[in-house]
């Protein structure tokens, strides 16, 4: 029997507590921050329900955002198919470096681009789920962005276009929509690094100031108070 301790829907990670009849040997967890492009890896899973399988590959990239400012992923060419999600991504020493998460594919099947949640992020999420039963992260809504440039007052400016957003949370409540463009973050340049830093290293109760360019109202500024993520 197993008991669910907590779930983080954004990362698609859950912690369960099981009652085992015998002692289990936990996997050793490696530091995912030490990963390098080209490192050899193995992906473990149950593709298409055919049974436990192992595929091999390399680290193709690290820090892949997939447009999600709350999560950076490991990219690998190890075969990850439906049924592999939730399986371990391990290094050559058999240590956990990530949890297989998703693939980029036009067909829904393996095309050489798979993603895993880094082990350090998994530990951080699991620790909060065990302590609090939920993830207490700083949250202004669930959304994805892409980097663009925008010409404002004859000046080329870096910006972030919202390409996907759920209709829940502070962004939605302020009337922000898909295709609205973030042109400033806390009075700084609007780029991926500033967005992720502002979300990860803020304190509850602080405010986030985002400047937008929209095709309906042109320029507008919104202030958001950081709140805990609602899972």
Q: Which positions does each model-derived feature cover?
A:
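Exposed beta-strand face motif in extracellular beta-rich ectodomains
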Residues: 206-208
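Generic structural signal for well-ordered beta-strand positions
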Residues: 97-98, 183, 219-220
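Edge beta-strands of extracellular beta-sandwich domains
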Residues: 221-225
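Serine-dependent protease modules
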Residues: 1-153, 157-158, 167, 174, ...
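Conserved PDZ fold ligand-binding element
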Residues: 171-194
